[in-house]
């Protein structure tokens, strides 16, 4: 969830004007799409209708079900202190599989190629989530309990936003970024496949620890 937000912000930096003095960017459609996505991911609402990010929603849900969150909190604290991803990782106790997954994300960001970043965001993350989360929600609903309420809310918000809004927006964005450029579409396929392989490796590790 944390490194997903870094992908989102990388796209916002590339597709919008975040420098002073402000000037309009060329791609009006992608500018609007990424700002809509950032609004939902960074400033959604919790169950009490308080503004919050999906990262914070997820963290709260994990704490409610009794999952340990000390390592991610320490890592983010290190990021704030160092303002450097690699230094923060070196100072944190993070499972190797999670580090490999995040390293891939930041390698993608470091390409500085917006269509590649967008393809990993779209096909490696955003487009997968609704179908994946629907099955988890079905499973949780079979065993209802107050401890899972926050997690259910988080999952259902993602299903609603990603399935109905963010998913279609992301597909429209990648289509606009790649256009008729065959090389860019080849990049999109290659990096999307790599992203999916990285996700499978991470899930396999998580499965081995359960």
Question: Could you say what each language-model-derived stretch is?
Answer:
Residues 2-210:
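Non-heme di-metal
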